[in-house]
Regions:
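Conserved HGGG/HGGXW glycine-rich cap/lid loop of the alpha/beta-hydrolase fold
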Residues: 12-59
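Conserved alpha/beta-hydrolase catalytic His-Asp/Glu region
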Residues: 131-193
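Alpha/beta-hydrolase
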Residues: 25, 54, 114, 226-229
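Flexible "cap/lid" loop of the alpha/beta hydrolase fold
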Residues: 98-103, 107-139
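Catalytic histidine-centered segment of alpha/beta-hydrolase-like enzymes
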Residues: 229-242
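Conserved serine/cysteine hydrolase catalytic core
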Residues: 177-216, 225
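Gly/Ala-rich beta-loop-alpha elbow adjacent to hydrolase catalytic centers
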Residues: 89, 93, 97
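Active-site loop/oxyanion-hole signature of alpha/beta-hydrolase fold enzymes
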Residues: 36, 44, 50-88, 243
Length: 257
């Protein structure tokens, strides 16, 4: 993915393909929301896939919250010169996508949420009481997936390093508090954007009842399930995820021309 990686001004981002822009928002731990397969597939199908690095650990602590990240995404979309985009978010990225849609509905042609936070906030994890215990962190990372083998050593190392970095831990807890403050339950019924929900039936972070609640509260939502799948559907079942997303894009007339 390196050759598609760009740094311009205050933004670092991955970009591939030409066409309808899909802006992808990752979760707290980038490695746990790996969109490689989605990026490869849709960049060859008439979409421009753009994945900005969100400043989760690099912004001032006062700007370490869902609302400030949503504003960052809006500024990035303006910087790129996009008129309207399809927003795709996983976990915290889904919450940021939702808040962005609430604040700037005119910028969002469609919304795709997978394992999104915004309604159910144990999604943010705890204060990692045993964060120095590598095996404990490994089990936490494995629990994100249906198949624990998805939590590679490289990925577990990334999570372990993050939770043992004091500043990152403080910011993670700050974001968790912000996510609870910015619960979306009251806002969702007013959000009429076409929304695609793709959920793992075995998601233990944002369980299936969360997807059902999103589906009930969002007026124009369509819910798709993936079996034997945890919190990161686009990583665990990329082909199925891509097929469902492509179907939805076709049915909602958001398909690239």
């Amino acid at each position: 993915m390196e050759k598609y990686y760009k740094k311009e001004g205050r933004y670092s981002y991955y970009e591939a393909g030409e066409g309808t822009p899909i802006v992808v928002l990752h979760g707290l731990m980038g490695g746990l929301s790996n969109f490689d397969a989605v990026a490869r597939y849709f960049s060859e199908k008439g979409y421009k896939i753009v994945i900005p690095d969100l400043p989760i650990y690099t912004q001032n602590i006062l700007k370490t919250n869902v609302k400030a990240f949503a504003k960052y995404v809006k500024d990035f979309i303006t910087f790129k010169g996009f008129d309207r985009v399809i927003l795709l978010g996983n976990s915290l990225g889904g919450h940021i996508a939702l808040y962005h849609t609430k604040m700037y509905p005119e910028k969002v042609a469609g919304l795709v949420l997978t394992g999104s936070s915004g309604l159910y906030e144990s999604a943010m994890g705890d204060s990692y009481p045993k964060r120095g215990d590598y095996e404990y962190i490994k089990k936490k990372a494995q629990a994100v997936f249906y198949d624990p083998a998805m939590a590679t050593k490289e990925l577990v190392d990334e999570v372990y390093a993050s939770v043992n970095d004091r500043m990152k831990l403080i910011k993670t807890l700050t974001i968790a508090k912000s996510a609870i403050r910015h619960n979306m339950a009251k806002d969702l019924p007013k959000m009429h954007v076409q929304t695609c929900l793709i959920w793992g039936k075995n998601d233990s972070v944002t369980p299936p009842n969360v997807a059902e609640e999103f589906n009930e509260l969002l007026p124009n939502a369509t819910l798709y399930w993936i079996d034997k799948c945890g919190h990161a559907a686009m990583m665990e079942h990329p082909d199925e995820f891509n097929r469902l997303l492509e179907d939805w894009l076709t049915h909602t007339h958001l398909k690239a021309h």
